[in-house]
Curated annotation (Swiss-Prot):
Biological process per Gene Ontology, one example term: protein unfolding
Subunit structure: A double ring-shaped homohexamer of HslV is capped on each side by a ring-shaped HslU homohexamer. The assembly of the HslU/HslV complex is dependent on binding of ATP.
Chain's role: ATPase subunit of a proteasome-like degradation complex; this subunit has chaperone activity. The binding of ATP and its subsequent hydrolysis by HslU are essential for unfolding of protein substrates subsequently hydrolyzed by HslV. HslU recognizes the N-terminal part of its protein substrates and unfolds these before they are guided to HslV for hydrolysis.
Subcellular location: Cytoplasm
Gene designation: hslU
NCBIfam families linked to this entry: hslU, PRK05201.1
Positions in coiled-coil regions: none
One annotated Gene Ontology cellular component of this protein: HslUV protease complex
UniProt protein name: ATP-dependent protease ATPase subunit HslU
Entry's family note: Belongs to the ClpX chaperone family. HslU subfamily.
């Protein structure tokens, strides 16, 4: 089921599989996604006036802000890009300007649309690839124009077609004309001029288009290459670009991470010279403007922006007022408790417990985590967070890696063993590091 047709409740249920708690953030994101679908159902004059309500997520590091965006990207069948606000500088300074956000989003949409189109024409491309390989194996008669006159009733051709489909010819080497690969050209340009580099690459790529050369290759590999080639022939580039740009304009989502890092603090000095400039450059993008990309003009009026930040050293009110007004929905994410850590380790679909169990199972080492073992692991991770820097759920990675360090190193020699990870095992491996503040700071 596509996220565009899912109800907010279904979207939240899907996010619950990977993210514990943070219901307010999940609900806000789910409603924003559903509003996309609702807007499409509204009649045209009013539909154009309905703009997405951008979201600002506020919360400490490691509580799920980025994970919500990452899972949303997989869930939403829409152009999506996650970028760090700190990568951009004010126009005129060395660095990337904010328009590259929309250019990158358009590139993603072109790639996504091309993949969909290639899948749509794949069956026709497979038939054409089959015929081209059979033309080499059983050369047909040719007309005055040199075009093959295929006789599908030919018994020999049908025999080879059957063998080709069965895979018995996969290792046979044939010589066939294959389109030349586009030369990879690396263009060095000053920061902020990436668009010029893309145009130069496109220009040189066009020079090698439609050129073929004979190549000796196995039937199996030839079949894959020719399918790609034939599918590309059947995709109309102009229609593809128009569809991709429309998809960006109507369904695009930009996740703007670390926005707190470009909020100028009142007491800060000259080091923040370009921070307010970046905020001012973001204003028209978030409000609605037209950005020139190499595929055409892209309007940003209906692109959804989701910003997030920890706001440890600054506050949302430190953002310039105009930008604050462009993010009307504000959601605070909660710090994680020890109980949340237990749920993260045991309830999520791709929990660390499942990941490490699967990894060591490849070496025939069977891990079994008990409830008290998981609880003790969560308590230690929470305790280290309380006494040192609070990095949220990311602390579980460090603690789990330290816990299984010896086991992972000796896994090859321990093949066939079963190891139970209970509270006693966790204490034996981690209690010393967790109890010493210095060790906890540098080891965990």
């Amino acid at each position: 089921m596509s996220a565009s047709t899912m109800t907010p409740g279904e979207i939240v249920s899907e996010l619950d599989k990977y993210i514990i708690g943070q219901n307010r953030a999940k609900r806000a994101v789910a409603v924003a996604l559903r509003n996309r679908w609702r807007r499409q159902q509204v009649a045209d004059p009013l539909r154009h006036e309905i703009h997405p309500k951008n979201i600002l997520m506020i919360g400490p590091t490691g509580v799920g802000k980025t994970e919500i965006a990452r899972r949303l990207a997989k869930l939403a069948n829409a152009p999506f890009i996650k970028i760090e606000a700190t990568k951009f500088t004010e126009v005129g300074y060395v660095g990337r300007d904010v328009d590259t956000i929309i250019r990158d989003l358009t590139e993603f949409s072109i790639k996504q649309t091309r993949e969909l189109e290639m899948r749509r024409v794949r069956s026709h491309a497979e038939d054409a690839a089959e015929d081209r390989i059979l033309d080499v194996l059983v050369p047909p008669a040719r007309n005055a124009m040199g075009e093959p006159q295929r006789d599908d009733g030919n018994t020999t051709r049908q025999t080879f077609r059957k063998r080709l489909r069965e895979g018995s010819l996969d290792d046979l080497e044939i010589e066939i004309d294959i389109a030349q690969a586009t030369p990879q050209l690396d263009v060095m340009t000053p920061p902020g001029m990436e668009e010029m580099a893309e145009q130069l690459r496109g220009m040189f790529a066009g020079l090698a288009r439609d050129k073929t050369k004979p190549k000796k290759i196995k039937v199996k590999e030839a079949f894959k290459l020719i399918i790609e080639e034939e599918a590309a022939k059947r995709v109309n580039e102009d229609d593809l670009r128009a569809a991709a740009i429309a998809n960006v304009e109507q369904n695009g989502i930009v996740f703007l991470d670390e926005i707190d890092k470009i909020a100028a603090r009142q007491e800060s000095g000259g080091a923040d010279v370009s921070r307010q400039g970046v905020q001012r450059d973001l204003l028209p993008l978030v409000e609605g403007t037209t950005v020139n990309t190499r595929y055409g003009m892209v309007r940003t009026d209906h692109i959804l922006f989701i910003a997030s930040g920890a706001f440890h050293l600054s506050r949302p009110s430190d953002l310039i007022p105009e930008l604050q007004g462009r993010f009307p929905i504000r959601v605070e994410l909660d710090s994680l408790s020890a109980d949340d850590f237990v749920r993260i380790l045991s309830e999520t679909d791709a929990s660390l417990v499942k990941q490490y169990t699967a990894l060591l199972a490849t070496e025939d080492v069977q891990l079994a985590f008990t409830e008290d073992g998981i609880k003790r692991l969560a308590e230690l991770a929470f305790s280290v967070n309380e006494r040192t820097e609070n990095i949220g759920a990311r602390r579980l990675y460090t603690v789990m890696e330290k816990l299984l360090e010896e086991l992972s190193f000796d896994a090859g020699a321990s093949s066939g063993q079963s190891v139970t990870i209970d509270a006693a095992y966790v204490d034996a491996q981690l209690s010393e590091a967790a109890s010493s503040q210095d060790l906890a700071r540098y080891v965990l």
